[in-house]
A protein has these predicted regions:
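Divalent-metal (often Zn2+) His-rich catalytic cores of metallo-beta-lactamase-fold enzymes
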Residues: 222-278
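Conserved beta-strand hairpin/beta-sheet module of binuclear metal-dependent hydrolase folds
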Residues: 43-93, 186-190, 194-200
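C-terminal segment of N-terminal export signals and the immediately downstream linker at the start
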Residues: 22-52
Length: 313
């Protein structure tokens, strides 16, 4: 039985204050949280679907008189703000589904805020294991004498390849396209509204995080983006986990194809450097923008390293 929402939110105020822990607790290599939460906003997208901008990956939401679904959880401080706003929109209905698009800290650290008022936390089958492994690494790295991090809250329901159910007046579908950003990325489609939450499969005109230790595959990421773009109507609106402010966290299939082209160019660029005989250290030191992709800015070691690993083996 979910707690009274107001009582629960009051008890989480202090927990939110320690949210800085999450940068280590659920994967130190995941995108980092700022020291102080930035401004937050609720933005309608289409129909019953909207997004919440705060600290971490973009949260998606569906609220109608019969059901509530949330996509991703950010960090505790902004998860609390998000939950308060969802309360206002839903009349404090229990949350039917919280979906984690993948395991990274900036998408799952807010799970403890949502858990007491959520019936089901849903993710791709690989995601809970990846989240627990990241938490174990973080716990092992805690200095002697320091308090251990709290245990992560992981999905209590999973799917392998596809999942689809009515959620109030909507139909929510989850699909897994194989290894890409990680090896547990979900794409969430609200079929009636034609809104598709991509999680971190799209960093809109930003250099992405490519989590090789978690099974990422640039080559399959490229194939996945092309498939997703082709499977949805031209009128679909896509939601992105992270975005260059100049371009924003929502857009069209053209953004997916731009991300596909960026990843293709990244692999080809690094492959060319390897064929030219450049050592890994020299490749990782390249800072010029990737040719044809000035909006992402100078190249950074994290993308070059992932591409090198995929090209050179």
């Amino acid at each position: 039985m979910p707690l009274n929402r107001r009582q629960f939110l009051a008890t989480t105020s202090m927990a939110a204050a320690v949210s800085a822990f999450n940068r280590r607790a659920l994967g130190a290599t995941a995108p980092q949280a700022a020291q102080a939460p930035p401004g937050t906003s609720f933005v309608p997208v289409r129909g019953t679907i909207g997004i919440f901008n705060g600290q971490g990956g973009t949260i998606g939401w569906h609220v109608d008189p019969h059901a509530v679904a949330i996509i991703d959880a950010q960090f505790p401080a902004t998860a609390k703000i998000c939950l308060e706003g969802i309360d206002q929109r839903s009349g404090s209905r229990p949350i039917d589904y919280l979906v984690n698009t993948h395991h990274h800290a900036d998408h799952t650290s807010g799970n403890p805020v949502f858990r007491p008022v959520t019936r089901t936390i849903l993710a791709q089958a690989n995601e809970p294991r990846l989240q627990l492994e990241a938490a174990a690494r973080a716990a092992a790295a805690v200095k002697p004498g320091s308090p251990p991090p709290p245990a992560p809250v992981v999905a209590n329901a999973t799917y392998e390849k596809a999942w689809r159910k009515p959620v109030g007046t909507e139909v929510m579908a989850l699909n897994y396209y194989g290894p890409a950003h990680t090896s547990g990325d979900s794409v969430i489609t609200f079929e009636k509204a034609e809104v598709v939450h991509m999680g971190d499969l799209v960093f809109n005109r930003l250099h992405p995080y490519i989590d090789k230790p978690a099974g990422a595959s640039i080559a399959n990421w490229i194939r996945s983006l092309e498939a997703i773009a082709g499977e949805h109507p031209k009128s679909a609106i896509f939601v992105y986990g992270h975005a260059n402010p100049k371009f924003g966290p929502t857009g069209s299939a053209a953004d997916l194809l731009a991300m596909r082209d960026y990843l293709t160019a990244l692999l080809e660029f690094v492959r060319g450097q390897v064929k030219a005989g450049k050592p890994r250290e020299a490749i990782l030191a390249i800072v010029e923008p990737l040719p044809g992709f000035p909006d992402q800015g100078p190249l950074v070691p994290r993308v070059l390293s992932a591409a090198y690993e995929e090209v050179a083996g």
